[in-house]
Amino acid sequence: MGGVAGHAGLFSNAYDLAQLYQLLLNGGSLNGTQLLKPATIQLFTSYGSTSSRRGLGFDKPEKDNATRKDPYPSRNAPPETFGHTGFTGIGVWADPVNNLQYIFMSNRVNPSRSNNLISQLNIRSQIQDAIYESIRR
């Protein structure tokens, strides 16, 4: 593709992402209107296979999170959690068990695409861990 890929081209804001993920947490309903069937939400937010953390529509927690050195997306995220961590620094996750959304927006590619400090320091996961730990107190 000559160095051009079909990812990292979708952009939004925290409010719109919160609306989308609330729709998903509500089983396809938002503001009293059923927009998607609950079965569709269940299909898209489930593990797609036994050998991968990927689902049909979203990433899922690693199945061995409890024993991983670097759990994904968070050591404390239950298996029902679904979301996506993006190239440009975004992390958007929904946890139906705790009725929780985690939306992290940054500009990882500033000042250049080679800036990978956010991943090297595991910032997104550490913040998500801190949120879960504060809820459990």
Model-predicted segments: where are they?
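Catalytic loop of the DD-peptidase/beta-lactamase superfamily, centered on the K-T-G motif
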Residues: 1-137
